Amino acid sequence: HNPSEYNGIKLIDENGSKLQDEIELAIESNIENISLPNTHTSFKESQEGFKVYFEFLNQLFDFDLTSFDLVVDSANGSAYKIIEKLLDVNDFEFNIIANNPDGKNINLDSGATNIDNLINKLKNGQLGAAFDGDADRLIMVDESGTTCNGDVLILLIAKYLSSTNQLKNDVVVSTVMSNFGFKNSIEKNNFKNIETAVGDKYVAEAMVEHNASIGGEQSGHIIISDKLPVGDGLLTLIYSLKALSFFKTTLVQFREDNIEEYPQKLVNLELNDMPNIQQIKELETIAKLLAEEKELDGRYLIRNSGTEPMLRVLVEARDEDSVAEFSNNLINKIKNFLQT
């Protein structure tokens, strides 16, 4: 989901899962000491993986597509070729934007983390879907032009899996970032919610531990474990559309009927030096004292980004005014602390 200068590689284990923290740390601590041979090697280009992946996704289109008018933002990323072919062969009414990667424009003013680009392209009644650059996450825009994050999509797919007897143990895994309204909806549906730290790898680990069918993050990383052990934006899109078709509803109507989200504000502070563990603890103390002073009827979350030099500060409360006031006060206190 980052600009091209952050492009890199992901290491996947033999089960198709992301590496555990201790293995990542071991690799990072040793990689600079490994001397690579100063020689060229050969490579082979193959379309076999594309064919297998296409067939895997295509066989899931077993539902009525006629009610969907879809606009897709592929973030000039890895989904650009396959999403067009999938929608074309299945006779969707669709349009695709940000679908011309040049090696530098990945996620540039587009994709799941720049959703305004998609919203501005939508006409009334159209459904929007935005991937990020590596297409492991999906954010949707409902027919009224309102953003639907991972919380909404997790609930939608969980209800579909439950209605078709595919929701193992009635368990849904989410992270501490999920909205309190989402958690209320999970409880109302008699699902058991397992909460993890932020990061799809922690979601995946909890899903294995609790034998869960679905889990994910508010950011749009969603894992449907009976199909894949990791998040996949295209798979999430197919299951979201499958669920809407099954329930014979629209995304805007599903949201209105099933989830009342609390106001949230997420601020990303760009920093040259990231706070260490002790500083984060001190910031949490500052936030706790402020919450007591302001009698905050809500919550806050302060954490370092795992991918960028940013401090992420989330505030959630029952009304917009409380969120805005507390967030502004907290951000000012954080800035003052970090400058001292």
Regions found by a protein language model. Give the residues of each.
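Predominant activation on well-ordered alpha-helical scaffold segments within soluble catalytic domains
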Residues: 28, 55-58, 81-84, 88, ...
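Gly/Ser/Thr-rich loops at beta-strand to alpha-helix junctions
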Residues: 2, 75-80, 135-136, 178-180, ...
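A generic beta-sheet turn/junction motif
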Residues: 76, 133, 304-308
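Phosphate-binding and adjacent anionic-ligand microenvironments
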Residues: 125-127, 164-340
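Short hydrophobic/aromatic-enriched beta-strand-loop microsegments
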Residues: 91-98, 147-152, 190-198
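Gly/Ser/Thr-enriched, mixed-charge loops and adjacent short helices
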Residues: 5-124
